[in-house]
Amino acid sequence: MIERDNGTKRHIPVLLEPVLAGLAPLSGATVIDGTFGAGGYTRALLNAGANVTALDRDPHAIREGKPLVDQFFPRLRLVQTEFSQLDRVIEEKVDAVILDIGVSSMQLDEAERGFSFQKDGPLDMRMAQTGLSASDVVNHLKIDDLIQIFRILGEERHSSRIAKMIEKRRRIRPFLRTRDLAHEIEVLIGRKPGDRIHPATRVFQALRIYVNDELNELTRGLFAAERVLKAGGRLGVVSFHSLEDRIVKKFFSFCSGNRKGSRYLPEVESAPATFFPLFKGGKTASEEELQKNPRARSARLRIGIRTQVDAMEADMKLFGLKEIANFESNK
């Protein structure tokens, strides 16, 4: 959400009040904001008296954040890196870590970044602006790979039909623009009057997650946060769709001592908890916030409190992401 402050635009992140309450006390605390974005959480943390190291892999976010660094120097440090590297950019243990997963409002609102089909732009979606773009994926990956991407990362039930349409169309003309791809999907799947969700939404989600390796980045970031937090420190994670939230929920459940087996990970002996939940389940936006910011509708906040137990060894299999991890390694 964007609010105006003295005539200037200022980003207000989702679930801000429960995030600040859940990470308190913040005065004098050392906090890592692993997903700086437009700086909404970082600014609020600084205003609450915290010392913040903010990370973002997007060079545009880093450039835009320089005035905030100047304003709050020396209490703010801004670093261009993935949040999975957060335990490598700060030496001391910290009091809190906040992660706001997925694409930022700033990225969605800039058509030239190619994250959204609400405005036409190049089919890009790269947060770090390096590596494969969404256009590269759509125009060059095998049809079976596209089906997997749409089915697993987008939970798209029409994945096969959409992938076959893409393969047929790209032989004639490549997909280079966001609205071109969205339009072709809408023509294929159809859209009834009053449908709230555009038929291309899940495909765009899947492409963005794949291009930026978001689920693997999240799993690595959770373990990194566990390593860097001091006893009593708090890890807050805001997620926006079921894939992300299942990973976060599984992580906190496992770290709390609930270590039931799965088809990916055999049942293991119980071990001392490295986290315990601040509250049961996840917090969602209030009706008041939803009226101001409809984007908060799918947001869910989970917070864990770090114990004195040593961090466990990172094991990606506990998330049940074996299929996704193996598939993504073939990019």
Swiss-Prot record:
Gene Ontology molecular function, alphabetical: rRNA (cytosine-N4-)-methyltransferase activity
What does the record list as coiled-coil region(s)? none
Give the highest taxon in the source lineage.
Answer: Bacteria
What Enzyme Commission number(s) appear in the record?
2.1.1.199
Give GO cellular component annotations, separated by semicolons: cytoplasm
User: Any idea where this protein resides?
Assistant: Cytoplasm
| Cysteines engaged in disulfide bonds, as pairs | none
Q: Does the keyword S-adenosyl-L-methionine feature in the UniProt annotation?
A: yes
The record ties this protein, via InterPro entries, to: RsmH, SAM-dep_MeTrfase_MraW_recog, SAM-dependent_MTases_sf
What keywords does the record list, in alphabetical order? Cytoplasm, Methyltransferase, rRNA processing, S-adenosyl-L-methionine, Transferase
- Family matches, as CDD domains: AdoMet_MTases
Q: Which reaction does it catalyse?
A: cytidine(1402) in 16S rRNA + S-adenosyl-L-methionine = N(4)-methylcytidine(1402) in 16S rRNA + S-adenosyl-L-homocysteine + H(+)
Any GO BP: rRNA base methylation
Where along the chain is S-adenosyl-L-methionine bound? Answer: 39-41, 56, 83, 100, 107
* Function according to Swiss-Prot or TrEMBL: Specifically methylates the N4 position of cytidine in position 1402 (C1402) of 16S rRNA.
Q: Which family does it belong to?
A: Belongs to the methyltransferase superfamily. RsmH family.
Protein name in the entry: Ribosomal RNA small subunit methyltransferase H
Show the taxonomic lineage: Bacteria, Pseudomonadati, Pseudomonadota, Alphaproteobacteria, Hyphomicrobiales
